[in-house]
């Protein structure tokens, strides 16, 4: 579990992913991917995300705040066990974690 973690493009240092299965081809809008995503304590993103694939997210452990401002303040807090399903085009984030967190995510194109 300690190897294979990389910071995804466009994410700040302290957020890392580990691809578990699959591959997502955003250019051809095909494929699927399963990954773990972890936030180090205190890390936050500064802008919302939007993409053209489905995303299902489960918060395994830690704390996650959604909707913070560019300085990491505010937002709505979510506990472990939280699940979200986002359709293509859904605006979501920014995100932060005060104590760090671990997420299980699936991304896929339907149809």
List where the protein language model places each region.
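A short, N-terminal "cap"/entry segment at the start of jelly-roll beta-barrel domains
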Residues: 1-31
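A short hydrophobic beta-strand segment most commonly corresponding to one strand
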Residues: 56, 85-86, 98-111
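Glycine- and acidic-residue-biased ligand/ion/polar-headgroup-sensing regions
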Residues: 41-45, 50-70
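Short acidic-glycine-tyrosine-enriched beta hairpin
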Residues: 39, 68-90, 96-97
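Beta-strand-enriched cores of mature, soluble protein domains
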Residues: 3, 35, 46, 52-53, ...
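Non-catalytic surface loops within mature trypsin-like serine protease
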Residues: 39-41, 109-110
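Conserved hydrophobic/aromatic beta-strand scaffold that supports enzyme active sites
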Residues: 17-19, 34-38, 56, 83-85
């Amino acid at each position: 579990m300690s190897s294979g973690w990389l910071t995804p493009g466009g994410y700040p240092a302290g957020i890392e992913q580990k691809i578990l299965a699959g591959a997502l081809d955003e250019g051809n809008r095909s494929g699927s991917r399963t990954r773990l995503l972890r936030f180090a304590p205190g890390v936050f993103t500064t802008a919302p995300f939007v993409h053209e694939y489905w995303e299902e997210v489960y918060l395994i452990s830690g704390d996650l705040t959604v909707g913070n401002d560019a300085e990491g303040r505010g937002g709505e807090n979510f506990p472990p066990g939280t699940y979200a399903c986002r359709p293509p085009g859904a605006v979501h984030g920014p995100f932060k974690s005060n104590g760090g967190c671990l997420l299980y995510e699936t991304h896929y194109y339907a149809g």
